Amino acid sequence: MRIDRLTSKLQLALSDSQSLAVGLDHPAIEPAHLMQALLEQQGGSIKPLLLQVGFDINSLRKELSAELDRLPKIQNPTGDVNMSQDLARLLNQADRLAQQKGDQFISSELVLLAAMDENSKLGKLLLGQGVSKKALENAINNLRGEGAVNDPNIEESRQALDKYTVDLTKRAEEGKLDPVIGRDDEIRRTIQVLQRRTKNNPVLIGEPGVGKTAIAEGLAQRIINGEVPDGLRGKRLLSLDMGALIAGAKYRGEFEERLKSLLNELSKQEGQIILFIDELHTMVGAGKGEGSMDAGNMLKPALARGELHCVGATTLNEYRQYIEKDAALERRFQKVLVDEPSEEDTIAILRGLKERYEVHHKVAITDGAIIAAAKLSHRYITDRQLPDKAIDLIDEAASRIRMEIDSKPEVLDRLERRLIQLKVEAQALKKEKDEAAIKRLEKLQEEIVRLEKEYADLEEIWTSEKAEVTGSAQIQQKIEQSRQELEAARRRGDLNRMAELQYGIIPDLERSLQMVDQHGKPENQLLRSKVTEEEIAEVVSKWTGIPVSKMLEGEREKLLRMETLLHNRVIGQEEAVVAVSNAVRRSRAGLSDPNRPSGSFMFLGPTGVGKTELCKALAEFLFDTEEAMVRIDMSEFMEKHSVARLIGAPPGYVGYEEGGYLTEAVRRKPYSVILLDEVEKAHSDVFNILLQVLEDGRLTDSHGRTVDFRNTVIVMTSNLGSAQIQELVGDREAQRAAVMDAVSTHFRPEFVNRIDEVVIFEPLARDQIAGITDIQLGRLRKRLAERELTMVLSPEALDKLIAVGYDPVYGARPLKRAIQRWIENPLAQLILSGGFEPGSSITGKVVDDEIVFG
């Protein structure tokens, strides 16, 4: 018998059986070796076949191992083993069976059938399992179908459904799918399309994260529960695993062969299988080589004839990009649009999923956390869809709590580190003999004893709390298992088991859980065992950088005295400071309009009065650094075309991929201060794109992405009307009227009308310049402190600086130049010439109308 007449899988099994014989020091390859190799073969058809007819695989393995152990062994084997007479006889018998069936190649299942001979050792072993040869023959006929074995690779293409699909109905039966809440209209519409005579292939289209795959899972659950029309009862919903279909297809035509075998198996099932293709667009172009067909084209005939019953899922963009371009493929599908659920629907979905996440993370999730997840994700995470983003919030918050439970609490960790530090110090002091060291050692030992007691007490509390949390998690897991069992009993119609579970086991477990929860001690809480609104808000803050979490007492006080803190940097300008502070307080209290920026201001006034400085102070107040400000110098946007730099170049232009300067900055940091400096210098068309930012808090960039400005404070500075401000000093009403007149002349009414507040900055008075001098000199003193130097100026020297630096027209900028000329320049020369050693104190006083240092 020629080896090349065996199928490739059987040849591989024969090769494995040879290795097995060599490894066990057997003189020849016996039928038992081949059967063992066929049984263990990856992707082989023998194991599924044996399971189908009722063989106990583990028992068969043991008996085969015992049979192999009984075979004689040879010493010093050469590794050259041949077939035994029994194996040659077995293969010849399989060859005869192949010829009877008209096969060109001998397949593995015919070897198994030939082995079921009561005269051979292997036959007795197989028949001893209680399965008849006739039953095996029927199973083999079902597996083979009507076709003959004319291809050596035919065994790879068999059971294509098992290899390349995942049975969703089976997973639903086992309770492995998450419950699908709501989405009744979409599931009903999908069923409606599936019931059609032709083109009965729905495709679920929606944004990423709206729950397209969940609808397919919901359909599987309805099929299992019998909640579908008669036409769909008993059908199986299989999900196509595109990765498995493509993976390992090395040679040209191998992918097409796999897909063809899959389609053949589906057609044999006579409409009993619905194929779910997630990410349907991947089928278009999949497996396409030079001149070969792609998967999409191979599906078309099967879809048109109704042989392939299919449910697809893809996003709107990919449907437009791939499916719509292929009109012949598109017409074979019926669109089912899946919209983003509302906040109320999302809350219902989360309530349905709550138990699954509680069991997985072993923590409780409060209803407040669910409502907060839906509301906060909808408001602050604008670039993703509900319910996906809300589910992610719950998942991450629960994961965070679980991590805290599993690791040591921060208080204990700090105490442990402190104890180690003190013990190291005590060890070092034991070597010292002087009086001071002995006293210090006594103190340290007292401290160590005190801390060890505190640590032991806290550790005891932590251990008991951890045990409580673990206990409730175990009860919750039992409740979940009982509910799954209840569902299975309902499907079987086992009323006794249903009654036992519904009215006995589950209520008892729920009572136990309630008792455990009530027993929990509220004081000394080291562990958080519940996910509440606060944890959800913390996760949102981490994701977006927007402070959503509950304000600490310190932050409340800070916000209430915001004006005082801003005045540490900005001298005077009471109206501007109050306006900005009120905007920030409104935003943090949650009272600002959710569809507009937190605040939008136009700062008007002469140069050097603190317009830009107030923005820097605001950024420092909010983010502890003035660098957290998005600063755009509008003088760079004088040309009409420069508006593209803000939102990104249009498609086809250089720089399209880079995105816009303003939009990208806000996408990365949605909570920021945006300063549009010298706004009147920009081209008038630039203000057109700011209209929707100021009104709706949103801007669409060149890629079509909507950027959210609702958590930003927008400040525009301008020198418009500065001449009128100088002329009308003291008369606030006349000043405002004159300035607003200048603003109305330069800007369009629809732009000015959208700004929350136009703030007019007063020219600086002499006493305000004195305050600014203190701030500027304070910064210089900081720089000197880095060189270990201190500086003191006499009152006369300060007066001299103020007199030189005060200019009502130019504001505080001349003061900066005065400090540079009178203080910094002479100091730099003295320091470089070695006039001051580190640790020196520098005194400045006026001598002959000059400031002299000594």
From Swiss-Prot:
Coiled coil: 391-523
Keywords recorded for this protein, A-Z: ATP-binding, Chaperone, Coiled coil, Cytoplasm, Nucleotide-binding, Repeat, Stress response
NBD2, as annotated region: 555-763
Domain of life: Bacteria
Binding-site list for ATP 1: G206, E207, P208, G209, V210, G211, K212, T213
Positions bound to ATP 2: G605, P606, T607, G608, V609, G610, K611, T612
Disulfide bonds: none
Domain Clp R positions: 3-146
Annotated stretches, region: NBD1: 159-340
Any one Gene Ontology cellular component term annotated for this protein: cytoplasm
Keyword flag Repeat: yes
Start and end residues of each stretch annotated as Repeat 2: 83-146
GO biological process, one term: protein refolding
Region feature (Repeat 1): 6-71
GO molecular function: ATP binding; ATP hydrolysis activity
Record localization: Cytoplasm
Family: Belongs to the ClpA/ClpB family.
Purpose of the protein: Part of a stress-induced multi-chaperone system, it is involved in the recovery of the cell from heat-induced damage, in cooperation with DnaK, DnaJ and GrpE. Acts before DnaK, in the processing of protein aggregates. Protein binding stimulates the ATPase activity; ATP hydrolysis unfolds the denatured protein aggregates, which probably helps expose new hydrophobic binding sites on the surface of ClpB-bound aggregates, contributing to the solubilization and refolding of denatured protein aggregates by DnaK.
NCBIfam families according to UniProt: chaperone_ClpB (TIGR03346), PRK10865.1 (NF008118)
Domain notes for this protein: The Clp repeat (R) domain probably functions as a substrate-discriminating domain, recruiting aggregated proteins to the ClpB hexamer and/or stabilizing bound proteins. The NBD2 domain is responsible for oligomerization, whereas the NBD1 domain stabilizes the hexamer probably in an ATP-dependent manner. The movement of the coiled-coil domain is essential for ClpB ability to rescue proteins from an aggregated state, probably by pulling apart large aggregated proteins, which are bound between the coiled-coils motifs of adjacent ClpB subunits in the functional hexamer.
Protein name (Swiss-Prot/TrEMBL): Chaperone protein ClpB
Source organism of the structure: Pseudomonas syringae pv. tomato (strain ATCC BAA-871 / DC3000)
Protein's gene: clpB
